[in-house]
Amino acid sequence: MSARPVAPEEVIERIIETRMIAILRGFTPEEAVRAGRALADGGARVLEVSLVDPRASRSIERLREELGAGCVVGAGTVITESGAEAALEAGADFLFSPGLNQRVIATAEARGALAIPGVLTASEVTSALALGARLMKLFPAEPLGPAYLKQMLGPFPDLRLVPTGGVGTGNAPAYLSAGAVAVGAGTSVANPAWAHEGRYELFEQAAADFLRSLGDTKGAT
């Protein structure tokens, strides 16, 4: 496909506006399209397809084709340069990684796409900033919690963090209140079991419920 990705600043704006990245993992391309459409109907219009899935590239292609400009579609679990290249060739608008890989960031930059590296420590944040990262994934978030994120923003007050891993309706508002710009949500909004059972209405309901749980809580900008 190799479609031109949405400009990085626009992707960042869409993520901040939506306050949530819905993570699709364990779906066939057909399931991903139906789930993605339902999630978008529920208000979750920033989607990520995990490269752990063997047909992730096809899922990204299909989502871009079917959902059009109404959604931003990225690739997740991007840990290698080859994975980054395959995802961008499939049409990914952004790369969401669990860790910090200079080659992944460089590959995204060369293609005009946004790379969101994963960080956990101040040293990793410093390295990511030096590489030009404008948005970072705090992973894994659950073992550390919102208080850790808030402490991380002390020396980095302009840092844009997206906590991911164990984030659901019970703790997402706290992360935003602590200073996150958005959160990454997996099975709490995109459970592959629902697709296997053909219950796609649950995706729309879960997305709407998740966003409703955030209330008026705004992430940092």
Regions found by a protein language model. Give the residues of each.
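Conserved N-terminal beta1-alpha1 strand-loop-helix module at the mouth
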Residues: M1-G91, A110, D158, T169-G170, ...
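Glycine-rich beta-to-alpha transition loops that act as phosphate-gripper elements at the mouths
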Residues: R25-F27, D53, A75-E81, S97-N101, ...
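Aromatic/hydrophobic pocket-lining residues that form π-stacking "cages" and hydrophobic walls in ligand
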Residues: A35, V104, A108, E124
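Glycine-enriched alpha-helix->loop->beta-strand junction motifs that scaffold or abut catalytic
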Residues: A40-R45, L67-G70, E89-L95, A110-I116, ...
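Glycine/Thr-rich beta-alpha phosphate-binding loop at enzyme active sites
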Residues: R45-V49, L88-A90, A110-R111, T121-L149, ...
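Active-site phosphate/pyrophosphate- and oxyanion-stabilizing loops and adjacent acidic/basic residues
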Residues: E61, K150-Q151
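Catalytic cores of alpha/beta
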Residues: T80-A90, S123-L131, V167-V183
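Glycine-rich phosphate-binding active-site loops on the catalytic face of alpha/beta enzymes
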Residues: F94-T107, L138-P146, A172, A178-E201
